[in-house]
Amino acid sequence: MNQMNQTIIDAFHFRHATKEFDPTKKISDEDFNTILETGRLSPSSLGLEPWHFVVVQNKELREKLKAYSWGAQKQLDTASHFVLIFARKNVTAHTDYVQHLLRGVKKYEESTIPAFENKFDDFQESFHIADNERTLYDWASKQTYIALANMMTSAALLGIDSCPIEGFDLDKVTEILSDEGVLDTEQFGISVMVGFGYRAQEPKHGKVRQNEDDIISWIE
C-alpha cells in the first residue's frame, strides 16, 4: 500500500465516536477552518448546498441544549467545537434561495435558467421529492450527512476527534434554537449535531467491522 493510501486508512482507524473530549485542548483556528471548508466544499444534489453550519461555542446555549440532547451529554461539556448542521426546507426551483444560487453564486446566464428550472422540476416530481414538505426536507437532510462525513474524515486526517449525534429531542431543541434566534424554522430544520476536539482517553476497544466479503459485492 502506498503512503497516501495508508494515510487515509490510518485516519479511518483513528476515527471513533468520541464520547468525551479533553476540555483543556482546543482546535486551532487553521485546523477548524479546514474542517469547515471541507463541509462547505462537499457535493450536493444539483449543487444546491441545502445546509447551514452553526458553530456553538456559547456555554449557556450548550447547557440549554444539553438538557434535551441525551446523546451529547459529555460532548457538549467538553468539545472544543460543537456544530449543528441544519437542512434547508422547501428547496424547489422557484424559491428565492435557488434563484439566488443560480444568479448570485453560480452566475447562470439568464437564457439558461428556464431549462434548469424545468430539469429541476422534472427531477423532483419524477422521484417524488416534491410530494410534500417532509419529502423535500428528507431529501435535503440526507445530503447534510455527506458534508458531515467529509468534515469528520478531514478532522481525522488532522488528528482531531469527532462524534456525530442524532440523540436529541427534535421538538425541544428546535424550540430552544428558535427562541434564541439561531434557527429560522421557516427555512431550516436541525439535521444532525457533531462535536470536535481531542479525546480524553483512548478507546477501550479496537475498531471492529464486518469482513469485506460480507458487505462488498462485485458485478463484472
From Swiss-Prot:
GO MF term (any one): oxidoreductase activity, acting on other nitrogenous compounds as donors, with NAD or NADP as acceptor
CDD domains noted in UniProt: NfsB-like
Cellular component, GO, one term: cytosol
InterPro entries, alphabetized: NfsB-like (IPR033878), Nitroreductase (IPR029479), Nitroreductase-like (IPR000415), Nitroreductase/BluB (IPR050627)
Keywords tagged on the record: Flavoprotein, FMN, NAD, NADP, Oxidoreductase
EC category: oxidoreductase
EC number: 1.-.-.-
GO biological process terms, semicolon-separated: 2,4,6-trinitrotoluene catabolic process
Cofactor(s) required for function per UniProt: FMN
Record carries keyword Ubl conjugation: no
Ligase among keywords: no
Pfam families (alphabetical): Nitroreductase
Family that this chain belongs to: Belongs to the nitroreductase family.
Stated name of the protein: Putative NAD(P)H nitroreductase SE_2073
